[in-house]
Design a protein with these regions (language model features):
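A small/polar active-site loop signature that marks catalytic segments
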Residues: 1-86
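C-terminal soluble interaction/assembly domains
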Residues: 52-196
Length: 196
């Protein structure tokens, strides 16, 4: 038996950097079709056609995800985590705090720690996405999805960050209750003997 960091810590680390290292394992467990079926199962019937996955790395031209389906999937994930005494900060990066794709984004003085989210990028002039959540005192958690296509990635990110800055100002957001765990999430696994 191997002992490693908890699964949530590993998932968080992988999501911080948008790492696809588990794609080969996922392929053996049913691949994109299995993930597509799971995603569609938690969506209302009318949204199910809005999720089509051709692969697990975002490179297949058949991949399709609508912004409203992305928001609904994030909302479902949030509710599942809440039911287990967790929240989105346990599995997704917090902008301006966690290392990775959101560390240097959405990090102004009134923005740091107020957005948890997931990025996605394909090519330099292909696709760029930001799906996230913002805690507010008046509206609860507000979810958003920004999916850009055929826009240079730096420009898409600039537009996404600007949209989020306006959203934060309009919603009078509050920071997530979050303290970054500085221990390495991915470290050498320990071999544990099962015999007494």
């Amino acid at each position: 038996m191997h002992r490693s960091q908890p699964l949530l810590a590993l998932a968080k680390s992988l999501n911080d950097y948008s790492n696809n290292i588990f794609k080969p394992l996922a392929d053996q467990a049913g691949g994109a079709l299995a993930v597509q079926q799971l995603a569609r199962a938690v969506l209302p019937e009318s949204m199910r056609p809005e999720v089509t996955l051709g692969d697990g790395a975002g490179t297949d031209p058949r991949n399709r995800l609508s912004p409203r389906a992305a928001v609904r999937l994030l909302e479902v994930l949030d509710h599942e985590l809440t039911a287990q005494g967790r929240n989105l900060t346990d599995i997704l990066p917090v902008a301006g705090i966690d290392p990775g794709t959101l560390q240097k984004r959405i990090n102004g003085p009134h923005e740091v720690g107020r957005v948890v989210g997931k990025t996605g990028t394909f090519g330099d002039y292909g696709a760029s996405a930001l799906v996230g959540a913002v805690p507010t005192s008046d509206h609860g958690t507000v979810y958003f999805a920004i999916l850009n296509h055929n826009v240079p990635v730096p420009e898409a990110r600039r537009r996404q960050d600007r949209f989020v800055a306006v959203l934060l100002g309009q919603l009078h957001s509050s920071p997530w209750k979050y303290e970054r765990d500085s221990r390495p999430a991915v470290q050498r696994a320990e071999l544990v003997s099962l015999s007494p």
